[in-house]
């Protein structure tokens, strides 16, 4: 009799446990979100110079869900080089936090900005390639980029 009760309650316990665990499994980490939104290491090819690069990448990376994200930047450098920025010059973030870092050297980036005629769901972007020093917010142990805070022109 006790075994029968256990067999009835065990599936219920499993379902209850999955209900708690599943939302955690589906949540994207800040570091993964940064990579999805801003990293395109292979993009330093002819494809990133295409006028439709931003239109394609913004959709592919799911940055146009529910609205047109007005501005986004893709970095065309190896992930290790971008992660290394977290150990370079510490600067104050735009929001006043102190966990931002500026790259010591310039990096290839593509800026995507909505055009004047862009209206959801038909998001349209202007593609501009640049070479700039980037600023990222970093968190964790080891410290990794979790937010793209901007870029700065070289002072040389």
From Swiss-Prot:
Keywords: Disulfide bond, Endonuclease, Glycoprotein, Hydrolase, Lyase, Nuclease, Secreted, Signal. SUPFAM superfamilies: RNase A-like (SSF54076). Substrate binds at residues 33, 36, 69-73, 94, 113. Glycans are attached at residue 90. SMART domains: RNAse_Pc. It is an enzyme of class 4 (lyase). GO terms for biological process: defense response to Gram-positive bacterium. Pancreas. It holds the Pfam family RnaseA. Its EC number is 4.6.1.18. The active site is at residues 38, 147. Disulfide bonds join 54-112, 68-123, 86-138, 93-100. Residues 1-26 form the signal peptide. GO terms for cellular component: extracellular region. It comes from the Eukaryota. One of its GO terms (molecular function) is lyase activity. Monomer. Interacts with and forms tight 1:1 complexes with RNH1. Dimerization of two such complexes may occur. Interaction with RNH1 inhibits this protein. Endonuclease that catalyzes the cleavage of RNA on the 3' side of pyrimidine nucleotides. Acts on single-stranded and double-stranded RNA. Belongs to the pancreatic ribonuclease family. This is Ribonuclease pancreatic. It comes from Glis glis. The lineage of its organism: Eukaryota, Metazoa, Chordata, Craniata, Vertebrata. The gene is RNASE1.
